[in-house]
């Protein structure tokens, strides 16, 4: 939180936007994870400066189900002030479940309504999460996607490809040359992530609840 200290060291800080919250994602956009120790350290500093810690959990299931994680759902609830459980990336039609770990803000329902985010049939969102958290379905879906992502990772490494980074979740970032990139664009849906150099690009593949093992094998054949 060096930024926070430097912020108040500036005598004109009142003319600036006041830092009000720390916002992180778990997993991150790169599929990487925070460790429990890292979350503890971040939350300790947040409390020191009386700033809430919010965790973006759009891909939370894939973080909790990762083989190498040491962060559980109860851990997360203790180490932040609010987080949300993403639904769409594990098969829900829409919606997220917001979790306030201490005390919900006053008039939260009204605030949601004022921002045009209140569904007339809110139970449609609730039913989805009730189903996802019945019989451990949420974790089963997440583990399925990670298992297939690991098959993809092992396959591309065996073929001699390099990874942009080592992601333990359902997102895999593969570096391909320009020729292979152009070829794949005609056959496969993926995200163009970043140019590694003039001749290579990192592309992202994300497995999900809907991915089948034969899909991964077909992709590996194209690669």
Annotate the PLM regions.
Residues 1-2:
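Short, small-residue-biased leader/transition segments that mark boundaries at the very start
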Residues 18-28, 33, 70-159, 164-168:
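Active-site C-terminal subdomain of aminotransferase-like
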Residues 21, 52-54, 82, 202-204:
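Structural preference for beta-strand elements that scaffold enzyme active sites
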Residues 28, 59-61, 89, 211:
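Active-site-proximal loop/turn and secondary-structure-junction residues that shape catalytic pockets
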Residues 34-66:
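Catalytic PLP-binding core of fold-type I/II PLP enzymes
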Residues 37-48, 71, 75-78, 147, ...:
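Alpha-helical scaffolding segments of alpha/beta enzyme cores, especially the outer helices
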Residues 150, 155-223:
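Conserved C-terminal alpha-helix-loop-beta "cap" of PLP-dependent enzymes
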